[in-house]
Amino acid sequence: MMKKPVVIGLAVVVLAAVVAGGYWWYQSRQDNGLKLYGNVDIRTVNLSFRVGGRVESLAVDEGDAIKAGQVLGELDHKPYEIALMQVKAGVSVAQAQYDLMLAGYRDEEIAQAAAAVKQAQAAYDYAQNFYNRQQGLWKSRTISANDLENARSSRNQAQATLKSAQDKLRQYRSGNREQDIAQAKASLEQAQAQLAQAELNLQDSTLIAPSDGTLLTRAVEPGTVLNEGGTVFTVSLTRPVWVRAYVDERNLDQAQPGRKVLLYTDGRPDKPYHGQIGFVSPTAEFTPKTVETPDLRTDLVYRLRIVVTDADDALRQGMPVTVQFGNEAGHE
């Protein structure tokens, strides 16, 4: 009769050992794998107008959620609209000049140039004949040297006028020179470039959100006169959300780009976020003071950037995160 309690006692001991062993195995499986500590890293960007001017309106305020493509603010457009009108007029003038160069001269202009040559030729012939007569009179001492010189000057002037008229007629008949056409084309292209710049300036007097995010600061108010590039808003980008962590050389082989990990925060200790290693620094550095593990603080470590694939609004800049490696994380 005494054997039965002994058997029961042995069974209890064995059962307790099995339970303890199972618990130990479960805990070892839970703790198996590398564990790192890091912080949430959300990028911020300063938004500004590329051009300067007076702030006409701002459409958002601090704390507002913004969407990519949303209009955030506008400068006074009037100066840029006037500048655009001016350069458009310049393009029209340059285009007309270029077209004129390509078209050459009209028949009426050529006819007028030919008539001018005939007139200049007649004037030259008369001046030449008069000079010849004056030479004869000079030889007979009938006129003074001054009279002969005046006749020569008149002949030379008529000759120059004739040559100018002939050159003009030749140009009209052959059309504009290639160099003149090229110069007119270059002037047109310069005017078109100024037009493109004026259109861009007008476009950039409206501030557009480049991506989704949350407005952190609003640095100016309507009526402020800004220089180009002056900060108007600071925005926290919604995506991507990263975790910055550090790994020592001993465990570096486990932290390869593409490796999936689990990310735990104090607010969600039982419901991890999912992440994937996107970048591993190629150079070692001393561990930053923010790293919570004392045994790493004096080591050389490598920086990791882990992309949170299921991030939500609960993740905030600088929030501490535990990075859990393991078979479950690596093969999800």
UniProtKB/Swiss-Prot annotation:
Gene3D superfamilies hit by this protein: 2.40.30.170, 2.40.50.100, Helix hairpin bin
Signal peptide segment: 1-16
Coiled coil spans: 108-209
Protein name per the record: UPF0194 membrane protein YbhG
One GO location term (cellular component): periplasmic space
Family: Belongs to the UPF0194 family.
Keyword Repressor: no
Taxonomic classification: Bacteria, Pseudomonadati, Pseudomonadota, Gammaproteobacteria, Enterobacterales
Localisation per UniProt entry: Periplasm
Predominant localisation class: periplasm
UniProt keyword list: Coiled coil, Periplasm, Signal
Pfam families: HlyD_D23
